[in-house]
Amino acid sequence: MKKLIFIIMVGSLFMGCFPITMQSLSQSSKVKAGMTTDEVRDIMGEPVMTELDRNVEEWHYCKFVVNKDRYLAIFFVDNKVIAKIFYTQAERMGDCSLFVKTGDYKVPPEVQAILDAPVDSIDTN
């Protein structure tokens, strides 16, 4: 029993040395199609990662959960939400922000259609 307590204490010390991202995903139901990036930021806070591919901007939020990290990806075109997805990742251990777009991540079909469109057919206003 003493050995188990010692192992737990030492493990806790090491876990305290690693940054862990704990974003709240509980407000995600408030994010709706057509919202602007500013409106989403007001609801969700700053994303852990953003990407821009052609005219699709993608924001990622994550929450470290033991054995299965939870993620939210929000997709914008012309500064407006067009899609959002939840996904999980359980294969790797560590801060969830390091494993964005892994696990069961899939680009939503409506976003993939935009990414697959010929470059000259994309409206860049």
Task: Say what each PLM segment does.
Residues 6-9:
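Internal alpha-helical transmembrane segments of multi-pass membrane proteins, especially GPCRs
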Residues 1-4:
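Positively charged n-region of N-terminal signal peptides that target proteins for export
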Residues 14-16:
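C-terminal motif of bacterial Sec signal peptides marking the signal peptidase cleavage site
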Residues 18-125:
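Residues within mature, well-folded domains
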